[in-house]
A protein has these predicted regions:
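An acidic/histidine-cluster motif and surrounding catalytic segment
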Residues: 1-97, 101-277
């Protein structure tokens, strides 16, 4: 294990960024430089702007969608990004993320990328390298939970082909592919839903968001009050708690002590209290 070069072999990162958000671009690329990440690509999120829906809405084959134009634009941007990756590289894997993620916790990883790749289950299609959840964060590798948010994501080539086959047809996009989970019916067709739910996805809490860039608001401008608390839990875990558990415990689930590696948010208790009052 090479802890002096933890990211050796890390796949190319594709990160999405609006053209006018140079602050976010500089933030991400400064982080990449700091960690010695040379293989990254910026993907413009401005090709499909929610404010210019009339320019691209004809490319969406769905007659009805349950979410706003910002989420639609984000979804077709991700599909096109994955398609372009398949057509322009022979890479086995890619990592996709948005431009508001904090890579600082890499400092505390007590393993390298090669070790991680040797630990993830053999049947994986995608692995979330970070996520938020309104209720709790399991600080170990585990199957993706429907209530997790979508975050930095590792996907393999076969799964990328499946996503494109499901959602891309002769230059147009079909988003609303049903997933038979009633808890998700309001987000069928969103990239946040179809990328983790169209195959076998695992989650591992490695990378957190940076709410200073407004990442605690969703694509419709609604506040996500739990994001900052999740970030605080990530920092608490990696700075103070992760050394209490072995790597074997961190990279496996279904253990007798899983409960001791879960951290609960106060956010939902606050919401319930407000509702009660």
């Amino acid at each position: 294990m090479n802890l002096k070069n933890k990211l050796k072999g890390f796949p190319t990162i594709y990160y999405t960024n609006l053209d006018h958000r140079n602050d976010r671009r500089e933030y991400m690329e400064t982080q990449f430089d700091y960690w010695g990440i040379k293989d990254y690509r910026r993907v413009s999120s401005s090709k499909y702007l929610s404010t210019e829906e009339e320019k691209w809405e004809h490319l969406v084959l769905d007659e009805t969608l349950l979410f706003g134009s910002a989420a639609v634009a984000n979804s077709i941007t991700h599909i096109e990004m994955i398609k372009n990756w398949l057509e322009t590289t022979d890479d086995e894997y890619m990592v996709m993320m948005e431009d508001d993620y904090d890579l600082s916790l890499i400092e505390y990883w007590n393993f390298d990328w090669e070790y991680l790749m040797n630990q993830i289950p053999i049947n994986w299609d995608s692995v979330l390298l970070g996520f938020e959840n309104k209720e709790y964060i399991p600080f170990f590798l585990h199957p993706f939970n429907y209530n997790h948010s979508f975050g930095p994501c590792l996907i393999n080539r076969d799964y990328a082909k499946k996503i494109v086959k499901l959602h891309y047809f002769d230059g147009k996009f079909k988003l609303n592919i049903k997933i038979n989970d009633e808890r998700l019916k309001k987000v069928f067709g969103m990239a946040d839903c179809f990328i983790p739910h169209s195959g076998v996805t695992y989650a591992i809490p490695l990378i957190t968001n940076n709410p200073d860039f407004g990442s605690d608001y969703d694509l419709n401008g609604e506040p996500r009050g739990w994001f900052k608390e999740c970030r605080d839990l990530y920092y608490e875990w990696w700075q103070k708690e992760h050394h209490k558990f072995t790597l074997n415990e961190f990279f496996n689930y279904g253990k007798p002590n899983d409960g001791g590696m879960v951290r609960h948010l106060k956010y939902m208790n606050k919401i319930k209290t407000i509702a009660y009052l």
